[in-house]
Amino acid sequence: ETVMLITGPYDAFAHLETLYLGVLARRTRVGTNTRRVVEAAHPKQVMFFPARHDHWLVQTGDGYAAHIAGAIGVSTDAQASWWGSEGIGTVPHALIAAYGGDTVRATAKFIEHSAADIQVVTLVDFENDCVKTSLEVARAFGPRLYGVRLDTSEMLVDKSVLSQQGRFRPTGVNPQLVRNVRRALDAEGFQQVRIVVSGGFNVDKI
């Protein structure tokens, strides 16, 4: 299938060939890979958070490619600029570290300085005990908390999974960890709190 047709004297655009082929190659790769992830995750939604893993100058075009491919949001304003939107995100590990590892306090400060319409999603793996931290932030913020994000390192096993190890890979974010957090939240009446997962995800892992 033809992606682009250029008509005219070759010497008028020959010098641009490397430029436009490079743009097409990168953006179609981002778009194709994002689409595969979106389809694998369906009906769950996918957010595109690549900004920390590549050069900052590629954010705008990559974000647009991911948007076209079906990602519901991107992590920076630059990535969202071509369609007039804004970046989305979560309370980061660095902010939690700045408050001595106190996720509840860091989340409170994030809320204090955020607009009321911001959907608050906070990381809950700082202490490697996602169940405990998820419950702490849910109890502290109730309906103001939109979701918790599990981002456990691929080199670590979450505390809630230690006693359940057996016939599955226990490291990082895995289905058992997600189930543990979901059950704990539901048991205390926090069914409305969503769970966001990240870290090492690809089509096969999904």
Predicted regions and their residues:
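Buried, small/hydrophobic-residue-enriched core segments of structured protein domains
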Residues: 4-188, 203-205
